[in-house]
Design a protein with these regions (language model features):
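Amphipathic alpha-helical hairpins
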Residues: 2-147
């Protein structure tokens, strides 16, 4: 079992190792930006799923309805994005820019909605922070693809 805090580094290095030995080499994609987008997106998807569940268990479910919806939408869109980023398909010419754009939007909405509840619920604060990191990483990767 890995030491505490090493799980993300391990996952990142495995993704990087596979990219490094992939027959296409993933073309000219910026590997550091790809690594960051994959790592932070995986974290955001997990945080959003867990936050939705936590919201459902709060006493004020009516107030949390939009947070639950945005978290579930975010998790689904970001999961699909991670899958697309994990395979090389021509990148700029493929659906990758479109799905990255969708992920950036979903992450932004989830971060905004979660932040509205952050002062009362720690899970919402953590989700908002994690989604913002993933939003930034995905934006940077998208920008590098469209240059």
């Amino acid at each position: 079992m890995p030491c505490e805090g090493t799980e993300n580094t391990l996952a990142q290095s495995i993704a990087r190792q596979i990219v490094d030995v992939h027959p296409t080499g993933f073309g000219t994609v910026d590997r550091k930006k790809l690594d960051a987008a994959l790592m932070f997106s995986q974290q955001a998807s997990q945080a959003a799923s867990m936050c939705a569940d936590a919201c459902l268990n709060e006493g004020m479910i009516k107030d949390m309805r939009e947070c639950v919806r945005s978290c579930l939408d975010c998790a689904d869109v970001v999961d699909a994005t991670v899958k697309c980023l994990s395979r090389h398909a021509g990148w700029a010419e493929s659906a990758v820019p479109a799905i990255l754009t969708a992920a950036i939007a979903a992450l932004g909405v989830c971060a905004h909605e979660s932040a509205r509840h952050a002062s009362m619920h720690m899970h919402a604060r953590l989700t908002a922070e994690t989604c913002r990191k993933a939003e930034t990483a995905c934006s940077e990767l998208l920008e590098s693809l469209t240059k």
